[in-house]
């Protein structure tokens, strides 16, 4: 069983995903996006966000934060994530991995780093991508191609984090970074598995536009 883990010594994020591939998967509304979908395509509900400004409000048991979606850099990733938000996929899930000074990680319906939505998409990030504090990105298995994503995401909680440009960029935190930082303290620094010291629930995610 593959798990989505952020291994500190190797700086690797893992998450289970896989399946057949299909090109020309349009988002809802007849978009012109050309997104490759692997896995169960019937579970994919990609929402074409176009060029407008869109963000996701994350309401947690420890407070709220908001991040803008990187629609230009990652059109397929953001379209997939928006579709998951729209159907309430994340509501009630937890931040199952918290590594102080590194990341908080959530979006796994299994709650142990092995789950996902049943499909994945790909947006290979730019070669000069830097995973700075407040950046939100998607996790993948060590063997998946760069930019592969399902539903598991992470938020970088500290500057100076060194990761290769392999993880699809989802967006940047614009509000509530203090909440992210507080959540980021609820882990054991000596535990690379990132087992939280306190349960943190994603009560609800909401897609916002404009």
What residue ranges belong to the model's regions?
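Cyclophilin-like peptidyl-prolyl cis-trans isomerases
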Residues: 4-210
